[in-house]
Amino acid sequence: MSGVALGIEIVSVFFLALFLLHRYGDFKKQHKLVIVGTLLAWYLCFLIVFIIPLDVSTTIYNRCVARHAVTPAPSNITVLSPTPGIVSNTTAQNHLPSADKLRSSDNSLEECSKPWSYIPRGIMPIFWRVVYWTSQFLTWILMPFMQSYARSGGFSITGKIKTALIENAIYYGTYLLIFGALLIYVAVNPNLHLEWYQLQTIGIAAANTWGLFLLVLLMGYGLVEIPRSQWNGAKKGYLLMKTYFKAAKLMTEKADAEETLEDVMEEVRKVNECIKYNHPLRKCVDTILKKCPAEYQEKMGRNMDDYEDFEEKNISYPSEKTLVKLHKQVIYAVQRHRRTQVQWSILLEQAFHLEDVAKNETSAAKQFVHTFPHQEPESWIMRRLYTPTIEWYWECLLRPWCSRILAVILALFSTVVVWSECTFFSAKPVLSLFAVFIQQAEQTHNYIYVEVVCFLSIFFLSICVYSTVFRIRVFNYYYLASHHQTDAYSLLFSGMLFCRLTPPLCLNFLGLTHMDVSISHQNIEPTAYTSIMGSLRVLPLIADVFYIYYPMLVLILCIATYFSLGTRCLNLLGFQQFMGDNDMTSDLTDEGKELIKREKRKRQRLEDGETRRREWKERYPTNREDTSRNRSVNSDQKEPTYTEMTTNRSSKYTRASNRTERDRIELLQDAEPLDFNADTFNDDPLDSESGRYQPGGRYLSMSQSNSRIFDDV
C-alpha cells in the first residue's frame, strides 16, 4: 500500500472539490479563469486537510522504527542534520555491519506495525512544498489580482492591470511590512546570519503570523456560536423568529440595492443618449451596457437614435475617466443587486420551510405537507425513500433531538480545543488533550484512530473559522449559495481565504498534538509538513512568544462571545442584531413576518394561476389543425388599427356568450392579481415620461400608491 493511499486521496479530493465548485459556481456563465483558479485553490486546501492525517500516522511509524532500532551503542537517538528543517535518521547503528543493520531493521518492523496509509520517505516533503507554495502564490498574488481585475472599471487590459495593482497595494504592503520587520530583526541580531533558507523561513513565518492573527479571532467566535446555534435551532419558533428578523434587515438592504442600481442605470441612460454611434468613446459605452441587466439593455437599445451626430458643440461629453468610474459603479451595483436577490430567494425558502414545520407539528396524519413544491426537482431515490411520513418524523420529532445531541458534542469539542490552546506549550507534563490522545494511540499503534481524530479535529476547526467569516456583517459582500448562485467575486474570495488560513490552521493543530518538535522540544523526527516550514528558531520572538501565548487569546474571545458582548456593542452602535429581549428586535421580527406573508400570497397566486391554466388546457385541448391554422393567420396578420384595438379592449369587459369564452376571459384576467397596483408595478425599467427607472415591487412604506385600501384584499 506504499503511496497508494496518497494517490487515492489526491484523486478523490479533486473530484470532491470539482463537485462542490459545480454546486456553488456556474461553469457555463462564469469565466474559465475564475473557475480554474477557484478549483485549484479549493483543491489545494482540501488536500492539506485530508493529507495531514496521513502525514501524522506516517511520522508516528517512523518514530517507532527509530525508537526500536537495536544498536550496540549506548545511545540511539535521531540526530538533526545541519540543514535546518531536514531531519536525518543517522544514529550509532551506522557503524554496524550490514547484517546487523538488516537484523535491526527487521526487529523494528516486527515491533512497529506499518500503517495502511504509509507513505515512503522523500515523497511528502516534495508534495508539501508544491502544495504550500502554490497555495501561497494563489492567495497573495494571483487571486487578489484576479478579484481586483474583475472589478476594475478600465476598458483595456493595461488599464485593468494598473487598477488591480493599485488596489492590491494594501495586501502586498501588509505582507512586505511583516516580512521587512522580521528581516530587520534578523539582520540586527548578531547571533544570526542571513542565508537563503533563513529568508525563506522568514517569508513563511510572516504568512503564518498574519494567518494566525486572523485565525484566533475567527475561531474564538466560532467555537461558541456554532454549538449555540445548534442548540437554539432545536427550540420551537427560535429559527422562525430569527428568519423573520433576517428578512426585515435583508429587505432593507435589497431596497437600497435596487435604488442604487436604478440611480446607476439612470446615469448610464444619460451617457448612452449623449454619446452616439460615431463618438470615439462609443465602444466604452457599449462595454458598460453589456454589464447592465438584460431589461435595461433592451430599453436603452430601443431609445437610442443612431442617426444623430455627436459633433454638437453645446453638449458636454463625459471623459474616459468618468466612464471608467461609471463602469466600476455598474459592476458593483449589479453584483450587489444580484447578491441581495439570491439571498432573498434563499431566505424565503427557509422561512416557508420553517413555517411548514410549525404547521405540521400538530398534524394528526403524521405526514409532512408542503405549502409550495420544491424549486429543484427531486431525484426518484429521494421520492421513494424520503416519503412524507419519514419527513414528518425527521422534521418534527427527530431533528430537534439530533440538534441538541450535536450541540452537546460540539460544545465538548470546543472545550477540548480551548483547553488545548491554553496548555499546548506545556511539554512536561503534557496538558493538551489532543497531545494525550495522539500519544495514547501512538503507544497502541492505532493509526486509524489517529487519522480519524486528526481529520475530524481539523474539519471542526475549519468550520469554526470559515463559517465565522461569512457570518460577520463586514464580509456580507461575499456569500456562498448553492444551486450555481454564487458569483465570481465570492468564489475568488473564498479560494483566497481558504489558501490564506488553512496552512496556519493545520500548523496550529500540529502544535496542539505536539507533533511539532518546536513545541515538544524533543530531538525526534518532525512531520513532513512542519519540516517545510523551517526552523522557527531563526525567529525566537515569533517561535517563543507569539506562537505560544497569542492562541491563549481564544479563551477571552470565547467568553466574550458566550455573553454576546460583541452583539450588544454592535446593537448600541446602531447595527441591529438579533436579541430576544430587545424592542427593536421585536419590531423587526414583526415586520419580517408581514413581509413573508406578502411573499407567500404572491407565490400562492402564481401557483393558483398555473394550476388553473393546466386545468383549462386539459379540459379544452386544441388539436393540431386549429393550432397550425391560427399560427398561419397570425403570421399574415397586419398591424391592428385603432378601431380594432378599441374593439378588443371593450370586448374584455363584455359578457361572454358561451362557457368556453367565459373560461378564457377568466384565465386572462387571472394574470393580474386582485391587489395589483399599476403605480407600484412597472414592466418598463425606464419610465418613458420622466426618463428615470421606476422600481418594481417596492417594500412596505417605500412604495407609494394612490389607493391603498384594497392592496391586501
Curated annotation (Swiss-Prot):
Cytoplasmic-facing ranges: 22-32, 144-167, 225-404, 471-490, 560-713
GO cellular component, one term: plasma membrane
Biased composition (Polar residues): 643-657, 701-713
Membrane topology listed for this record: Multi-pass membrane protein
Residue ranges, compositional bias (Basic and acidic residues): 605-629, 658-667
GO term, biological process aspect, one: adrenergic receptor signaling pathway
Compartment list: Cell membrane
UniProt-annotated stretches for the region Disordered: 600-713
Pfam family, one: LMBR1
Membrane topology, Extracellular segments: 1-3, 54-122, 189-203, 426-449, 512-538
List of glycosylated residues: 76, 89
Coiled-coil positions: 246-314, 587-620
Keywords on record: Cell membrane, Coiled coil, Glycoprotein, Membrane, Transmembrane, Transmembrane helix
Membrane-spanning parts: 4-21, 33-53, 123-143, 168-188, 204-224, 405-425, 450-470, 491-511, 539-559
Record PANTHER family: G-PROTEIN COUPLED RECEPTOR-ASSOCIATED PROTEIN LMBRD2
Protein family (similarity comment): Belongs to the LIMR family.
Task performed by this protein: May associate with G-protein coupled receptors and regulate downstream signaling pathways.
Protein name (Swiss-Prot/TrEMBL): G-protein coupled receptor-associated protein LMBRD2
UniProt source species: Xenopus laevis (African clawed frog)
Phylogenetic placement of the source organism: Eukaryota, Metazoa, Chordata, Craniata, Vertebrata
